[in-house]
Amino acid sequence: MTFRMTSLVLLLLLSIDCIVKSEITSAQTPRCLAANNSFPRSVMVTLSIRNWNTSSKRASDYYNRSTSPWTLHRNEDQDRYPSVIWEAKCRYLGCVNADGNVDYHMNSVPIQQEILVVRKGHQPCPNSFRLEKMLVTVGCTCVTPIVHNVD
């Protein structure tokens, strides 16, 4: 065998060995951090929110005045921070016109925002926390419908 061929065979064998070892490791149960008396029982986290008291106060009734109004629903999960997240649900399939009637020639669609939440761990490590992405509906908007012409 040439040096190049020998190197490729060794690389292949090394790769297979790594894959097998990683599958054996991943099949085992994850280990939790051991309890330690010097580890604090609670941790204080300071959240610094910029522009908290800005003068750009928004009207709180956008959900009623919109041409695509929505209702807010409480999403509560005690194992998550924040534990309460308010989510929007579009009231109509169509949009509200200037007369206050629903116009089904337009579509009311949700506006979604991805946020980060902290989730409390469960078995086998109940005292752990993990950061998760969550898709939240924050409002609704009015759009023109997608029309497919059949020829």
Curated annotation (Swiss-Prot):
GO terms for molecular function: cytokine activity. Keywords: Cytokine, Disulfide bond, Early protein, Glycoprotein, Secreted, Signal. InterPro entries: Cystine-knot_cytokine, IL-17_chr, IL-17_fam. Disulfide bonds join C90-C140, C95-C142. Glycans are attached at N36, N53, N64. GO terms for cellular component: extracellular space. Pfam families: IL17. Residues 1-22 form the signal peptide. It is found in: Secreted. Belongs to the IL-17 family. This is Viral interleukin-17. It comes from Saimiriine herpesvirus 2 (strain 11) (SaHV-2). The gene is 13.
